Amino acid sequence: MNKKSIRDVDLKGKRVFCRVDFNVPMKDGKITDETRIRAALPTIQYLVEQGAKVILASHLGRPKGQVVEEMRLTPVAVRLGELLGKDVKKADEAFGPAVQEMVAAMNEGDILVLENVRFYAGEEKNDAELAKEFAALADIFVNDAFGAAHRAHASTAGIADYLPAVAGFLMEKELEVLGKALSNPDRPFTAIIGGAKVKDKIGVIRHLLDKVDNLIIGGGLAYTFVKALGHEIGLSLCEDDKIELAKEFMALAKEKGVNFYMPVDVVITEEFSETATTKIVDIDSIPSNWEGVDIGPKTREIYADVIKNSKLVVWNGPMGVFEMTPFSNGTRAVGQALADAEGTYSVIGGGDSAAAVEKFGMADKMSHISTGGGASLEFMEGKELPGVVCLNDK
């Protein structure tokens, strides 16, 4: 990684504005999944050990520039204190005189959690005045919120105009793992692209066709490719305006010597429910009033075999509607193949794929689970991320 990290700067006695991703799911004021809080702990602990005054900033939910009581970060600050076993103070605002007083009273190793930065309309507009207010609280900016790195916001990018800016450990690991996958991958390198829509994955497919040895397609977006080959797909999801693009991608793969894998059989249903009747049919035999909802057993075997023989696998997007049990076997099978593959480095691209390996209890068998769905997707598209570009070079 060619960006400075917290290892490269002197932190003792410094006020550090650390942007973290504490955007955790909440229900009735309780945190239902604290993965993101735990992911930030190594950076926070390091800052504390180095004698910094640690000021933590995050968003939670989408309050759209106004105060929404149930989106306050108070429960997060409480839980953070429990996890660290130390006192964590919480401000009622994210800047201003009251916050400045709290910062002035901090000792080395103290932690202060600011209020939800998205309570202020200037945050998502990357407003320079708000960025200056944030910067006024600190001596150094640390970005450890990879999940928000694709956003040019006041607390993720704008603040870096006014302070030295470095990466936290979580950000550093994401950039190293994803960066190596794209610039210097171990081979064979396989990308598994699933999810519902082709339009969401156009950029990533196009960018990866130049880099991978194998491209595996699954999920709802597969049916646009199936239709592009001239097969009937019944009521399956399809983007007719993307059929020509699908043809172009398949031709490009051939031209570049990329093995392009598509479902050979699928699970079909007439209704979306937990108790749905399903059938397995070959890809060219989907009846007109049925819909494809998962990859079939023959496809699972082929995909598992490709995975097993790969050195690096990047997975972005499920193989079917994994939230419903009858349609979850394809996604589970891909997860299982990754869990069982020896000598294969697996990178799970955040979002639904991360939720799936979590749901199936396979998370600890994956080499790297990205903490950013949208951010990892944009990184995989070869885009520059504002929250990364703004960091100081080594």
Curated annotation (Swiss-Prot):
Residues that coordinate or bind substrate: D21, F22, N23, R36, H59, L60, G61, R62, R118, R151
SUPFAM superfamilies: Phosphoglycerate kinase (SSF53748)
Residue(s) carrying Phosphothreonine: T299
InterPro entries: Phosphoglycerate_kinase, Phosphoglycerate_kinase_CS, Phosphoglycerate_kinase_N, Phosphoglycerate_kinase_sf
Modified residues (Phosphoserine): S183
An example Gene Ontology biological process: glycolytic process
Reactions catalysed, as given in the entry: (2R)-3-phosphoglycerate + ATP = (2R)-3-phospho-glyceroyl phosphate + ADP
Homology family: Belongs to the phosphoglycerate kinase family.
Official protein name in the record: Phosphoglycerate kinase
Originating organism: Bacillus cytotoxicus (strain DSM 22905 / CIP 110041 / 391-98 / NVH 391-98)
